[in-house]
Curated annotation (Swiss-Prot):
Residue range of the transit peptide in the UniProt record, numbered on this chain: 1-36, 37-76
Name listed for the protein in its UniProt record: Peptidyl-prolyl cis-trans isomerase FKBP16-3, chloroplastic
GO molecular function list: peptidyl-prolyl cis-trans isomerase activity
Chief subcellular location: plastid
Compartments in which it is found: Plastid, Chloroplast thylakoid lumen
Pfam families: FKBP_C
Source organism: Arabidopsis thaliana (Mouse-ear cress)
Similarity comment: Belongs to the FKBP-type PPIase family.
Any one GO CC term of the record: thylakoid lumen
Record EC number: 5.2.1.8
Every PPIase FKBP-type domain range: 124-216
Top-level taxon of origin: Eukaryota
């Protein structure tokens, strides 16, 4: 269990308290971000309502391993991998075959499914992104789409795995990208398996499809 490695997602409750500062509190993007944070705080309150010790242990293991609560709910429901929502469906996969691969100095590789518009997020800025995380075989081990809400974190600040951090830093709002993350930039201690979720071996490569929905701070400045 990768308890000492960077968590996959930053808890939105703490993010909204410390980082969602904007010049326009009535901005639609700002309000949306506050709703996202509120939803996550409500999810955390469900810990006290778990019906059994086994459910409580499952939740604790999932959170410490960097998994979203929504993912655990989907796995517990026995949702088959092929029925899980994806950012890149069959037609997208075919088109991706003709997209050139970009390789960075760190070894990260990526293909742009869709190039966004505007500036890339500066280091330390809040970003709202959807993602689908997979092992090389294509099996999903975590996904924000299963809850239907994007996640917020400070990009470039070590709040997510290194490959995801680096991959998003050069994206633009509205963009969508597939990241081929090598082991050293992924999960050094791996992730344990769970019902409906494959094991991620230590220092093994993973694939992330990422959609950068918006950048709250830049959005408020533009308005």
């Amino acid at each position: 269990m990768a308890a000492s490695s960077p968590s996959l997602l930053l808890p939105l409750g703490s993010a909204s308290r410390n980082g969602l500062t904007t010049k326009n509190p009535n901005s639609s993007r700002y309000i949306a971000a506050r709703v996202i944070a509120s939803e996550t705080r409500e999810q955390s309150c469900k810990i006290s309502n778990l019906s059994s010790r086994r459910e409580a242990m499952l939740l604790v293991l999932g959170v410490s391993g960097g998994l979203s609560m929504s993912s655990l709910a989907a796995y517990a429901a026995g949702l088959p991998p092929e029925d899980k929502p994806r950012l890149c469906e069959a037609e997208c996969e075919k088109e991706l075959e003709n997209v050139p691969m970009v390789t960075t100095e760190s070894g990260l590789q990526y293909k742009d499914i869709k190039v966004g518009r505007g500036p890339s997020p500066p280091v330390g800025f809040q970003v709202a992104a959807n993602y689908v995380a997979m092992v090389p075989s294509g099996q999903i081990f975590d996904s924000s789409l299963e809850k239907g809400l994007p996640y917020l974190f400070r990009v470039g600040s070590g709040q997510v795995i290194k490959g995801l951090d680096e991959g998003i830093l050069s994206m633009k709002a509205g963009g969508k990208r597939r990241l081929y993350i090598p082991g050293p930039l992924a999960f050094p201690k791996g992730l344990v398996s769970a019902p409906g979720r494959p094991r991620v071996a230590p220092n093994s490569p993973v694939i992330f499809d990422v959609s950068l929905e918006f950048i709250p701070g830049l959005d408020s400045e533009e308005e």
